[in-house]
Amino acid sequence: MSGEARDNPGLDPALNRAPEGPRWGRRSLGRLDSDLGSDRGGPSYAALDLGTNNCRLLVARPAGESFRVVDAFSRIIRLGEGVSALGRLSEAAIERAIAALTICRNKMKNKGVSRARLIATEACRAAENGAEFRARVAEEVGLELEVINRETEATLAATGCTMLLDPQAEGALLFDIGGGSSELVWLDRSQKCNGGPPLPQIRGWVSLPLGVVTLAERHGGVSVTPAIYEAMVSEVAALIAPFAHEHAAAALRGIHMLGTSGTVTTIAGVHLNLKRYDRRRVDGCWMDEREINAVIERLLSMNYQDRVASPCIGVERADLVLAGCAILEAIRRAFPCPRLRVADRGLREGILVQMMREDGVWGEH
């Protein structure tokens, strides 16, 4: 679920050709030619996150000690569909990704983006044809994707969410439930800077090699019985156990959970009885154990058609949301924190903060 526009125009065949001029990517982060965009008003930065399930873009400009979003895009593309079974990105998934990336390229061009970082995560890490896919994106779209490792993914998610850490808390357990992997990060109280958002203080992290897409494909996401749900929880719990043992219960004093993912924003939307997704109400929302349990029980009582009909779920997430709940449940059982703060932010915001800090836009380098 996302509060951003889901553009879905038909692709002009001409857009399948790489654009003339410079390409965006990790190795081309400098200023772009002056004729690339007419939307001025300070330097524009772009952060793109191509995940197993979603393609997401944020374009922003520095504003005060943070930044202002000037354009955004989010589309569920299921790039990693079938990768866990076949080991390859399918042609249909590649076409969906290229269509979404073409829209992102045009948005960056229209906003006159001067610096960008375009990351790809688990689907491209795991697929044997990931390099071939990236070469095709460079050729057809003109974008150079950077495949990041799991530690970088965890760090960027933490950087993007640090502003939601309760300043009265000793720290937080951040989790990011993705399509193909899920990250858990122990955060100590954040460190204030001379300018810009606070810096995350990471005590430890782990990346689990599964997410909502891989778990739903393995167990089934359409008809989820209580036994199937518990099997999903048990599989995730076994992967979490070593990390939970390392960071035992004593560390939970003064800690809250901080969740970023479509799973937790969906749960928050259901909890708030939203008829239409509203990021302003979801981002930063607090939920306690009783409220989380009530939503999960409600979702488990729904059949597939009920989930499709829910304005907070819809057809794009109806077969994935219970897998996400199972991952969340395994995390909660391992780390029984009484409060959860919901974040509709994460990797892209972390990328933007990192680039702007490197450029010294908040008065430091």
Task: Locate the predicted segments by residue.
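Short acidic/polar active-site loop segments enriched in Thr and Asp
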Residues: 53, 114, 338
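Non-catalytic pre-domain segments flanking phosphatase-related domains
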Residues: 1-44
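A short acidic Gly-Thr/Ser loop motif
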Residues: 49-54, 175-181, 260-264, 346
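Conserved glycine-centered beta->alpha loop in an early N-terminal alpha/beta scaffold
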Residues: 119
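N-terminal glycine-rich anion-binding loops that anchor highly charged ligand groups
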Residues: 65-77
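Helical "lid/coupling" subdomains associated with nucleotide-phosphate turnover
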Residues: 3-4, 59-62, 78, 82-111, ...
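Short acidic donor-binding loop at the edge of a beta-strand
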Residues: 44, 170-173
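N-terminal basic/disordered segments at the start of proteins
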Residues: 40-66
